Amino acid sequence: MRKKFLAVMTAAVITTMAFTGCGSSSNDKTTDAGTNASTALTGDISVISREDGSGTRGAFVELMGIVDDQDNDITTQTAEITNSTSVMLKTVSQNEKSIGYVSLGSLSTDVKALKVDGAEATAENVKAGSYKVSRPFNICYKEDKLSDLDKDFISYVMSEEGQKIVNDEGYIGLTPEGKYTGSKQKGKITLAGSTSVSPLMDKIKDAYTAINPDVTIEIQESGSSAGIQAATEGAAQIGMSSRELKDEELSAGLTSKQIAMDGIAVVVNNANPLTDITSDQIKGIYTGETTKWEDVK
C-alpha cells in the first residue's frame, strides 16, 4: 500500500513539473517591436526604398531622421529601389523579409502596416496627431498661366465635393472652400507628378469629368520632383507633390496649394509576425545600422 502511494505521488510531481514547463512558454518575453521572441523573424532585412525624387521618400527620410547633419538622405546603399507605389507594394508582398513604406491611402491587404511607436496607421490617428509619419499632398502651378478650366478644376478639388472624395478614399481632407459652382467646361488639363497623389487625383478626375464631360484630364505618374519640374517648365498645367516644395522650386514662380494630408505606412510582408516598430528601429534599418530581423527588438 505504501509503495502504491509513493508511485501515485511521484506521478503527480512529474505531471506538475510537465505542466509548469509547458506553461513557461506563455510567459516568454515580448520584444519592444511587438512580437513574441520565439516566433520573431530572423535573417537579413531586405530594405525597400523609393527612388530619389520621390516625395514619399523625401518626407519619410525627413520624418524618420534618415538624414545627416546637412539634411542629406542617408538611406543605405544596399536598399532595393522601386519607382512607384504599386511596385513598392508588389515587392514587399513577394519578399517575406522585406520592409518598405507607402502612402496610407494606397495601402492594400497584400502587405501589413506596422504600428509606429504604438500608433496604428489610420486616417483617424493621422488627424488626431498620434500617428506621426504623415505629410501633405500638394499641387503646384504657375498662377499667371492658369486657364479658366485649370482654375475651375482646382476649385473643385478644394470644394465640399472634392474634399469628400479625399475623405472617402482614406486620406485626410481639409476644410472645404465652399460648394462647387462651376459651369460646363471644355478643354484639356495635364497633371504630372507623385505616384502617391495620382490615385486620389484619378478619383477626383472621374467625378469632375462626370460633371464636365467635355473636359479631358491626363494624369502622368512621374514622381514629385518630376511633376514640379513639369509645372515649372509648362509641360503640365498642374504638378502633384507628396512633399512640401523647396524654396528654390517656389522661387521659380510656382504656387503650392495643399489639397489633403496623408500618412506614410511602414509595411512588411503578411508572413512577418512583427506588429509594432519604433521610429529608432526604422531609422536603424534604413541607415543600414540594423541588418538582421532578430536585432529588431
Model regions and ranges:
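C-terminal motif of bacterial Sec signal peptides marking the signal peptidase cleavage site
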Residues: 16-21
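Sec-dependent signal peptide hydrophobic core
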Residues: 5-13
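Exported/periplasmic ABC-transporter solute-binding proteins
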Residues: 4-6, 23-297
